[in-house]
Amino acid sequence: MFEQRVNSDVLTVSTVNSQDQVTQKPLRDSVKQALKNYFAQLNGQDVNDLYELVLAEVEQPLLDMVMQYTRGNQTRAALMMGINRGTLRKKLKKYGMN
C-alpha cells in the first residue's frame, strides 16, 4: 500500500510491513534503494542512458496521476507541474498518453 503525504514539500511512501505497521519514508529513499538493487544486478556491466531510464520510471506515473487529478486539463496539469503546456504535450506524446 502506497500513499503520498499531502501537507509536505517532501513526497513520502507509506508501506505496511508483515506486522501491519505503517512506516513512511521519503520517495527519494525508495528511489535510492531501487538504484542500489539495480546496480547490484549489473555485476559490473556497463550501463547507458541510466538517467533516461530513471526519468521514464518516475515521469510516466507522474504524468498519469497529474492528468487524472486535473481530469485531463492540460493547462492546469502544466501549471501544476511547473512546465509549459507545449512541453507537457510533448511528454504525453512520448509516453503514448495523448
Swiss-Prot record:
NCBIfam families xref list: PRK00430.1 (NF001659)
Residues of the DNA-binding region: 74-93
GO biological process, one term: response to radiation
Gene: fis
Listed InterPro entries: Fis_DNA-bd, Homeodomain-like_sf, HTH_Fis, Trans_regulatory_Fis
Protein name: DNA-binding protein Fis
Compartment(s) of residence: Cytoplasm, Nucleoid
Stated role: Activates ribosomal RNA transcription, as well other genes. Plays a direct role in upstream activation of rRNA promoters. Binds to a recombinational enhancer sequence that is required to stimulate hin-mediated DNA inversion. Prevents initiation of DNA replication from oriC. Binds to hundreds of transcriptionally active and inactive AT-rich sites, approximately half its binding sites are in non-coding DNA, which only accounts for about 10% of the genome.
Keywords (A to Z) from UniProt: Activator, Cytoplasm, DNA-binding, Transcription, Transcription regulation
GO cellular component, one term: nucleoid
Family label: Belongs to the transcriptional regulatory Fis family.
